[in-house]
Curated annotation (Swiss-Prot):
Responsible for synthesis of pseudouridine from uracil-65 in transfer RNAs. CDD domains: PseudoU_synth_TruC. Belongs to the pseudouridine synthase RluA family. It comes from Yersinia pestis. GO terms for biological process: enzyme-directed rRNA pseudouridine synthesis; tRNA processing. It comes from the Bacteria. The gene is truC. One of its GO terms (molecular function) is pseudouridine synthase activity. This is tRNA pseudouridine synthase C. It is an enzyme of class 5 (isomerase). PANTHER family: MITOCHONDRIAL RNA PSEUDOURIDINE SYNTHASE (PTHR21600), TRNA PSEUDOURIDINE SYNTHASE C (PTHR21600:SF56).
Amino acid sequence: MLEIIYQDEHIVAVNKPAGWLVHRSWLDRNETVFVMQTVRDQIGQHVYTVHRLDRPTSGVLLMALSSDVARMLSLQFEQHQIQKTYHAVVRGYVLEGGTVDYAMAEELDKIADKFAKSDKAPQPSVSHYEALAQVEVPLAIGRYETARYSLVALKPETGRKHQLRRHMAHIRHPIIGDSTHGDLRQNRGVAQHFGCSRLMLHASHLHLNHPVTGEALTLTARWDEPWQGLMSQFGWSGIAPHLERVEFPLTASQDNE
């Protein structure tokens, strides 16, 4: 069973585990575990997706319980009326907050976007980040005798594919566990020495107005066991107590894309 963090007669939100696909995809015919089907079976009714999380990303996933509500929520996302807050562990010291305003060309999938045009102009892309904690560990990865990491809060202003992963890599603080845009040596080092191989990107909060009642909602998804384990080893326990504690009884294959 998935952790349901909010449910009423119109919407449902769950804490999506890292490694889970949101829905069935012909790109991965061998996968058998999906968020939509699991939630549908769990609550006994059809659900409608209104946004997505990449497979290796965990956290708040909001779904509608009717097509009408799905349209209303989709419009809120399109008009940037819903605010998202993520947390990430990145390479290096991030000592203060800032904004990444860096236009990005569309990132095409070799299979899914085989026939898509590859000459589109870069799209405006803006992300905000906040420094929360830093650590230096006596671990020689690469040319240095120690390794430095930071915990950051991220708030995307736009919603491009892999935006946060690409923006943090652009400012030389790639997200740990990102095999596409990250530092592969750091990824291996963290996996080998700290036992954490997942992408360290988590959708912690969604702030929105309820599509039917207008009530202001803040949906919060807490960290899973691997994430919390790394927080403990880095001495970061207690920095965000409202996000600590949750275990997923079901397992799914990890895929860092």
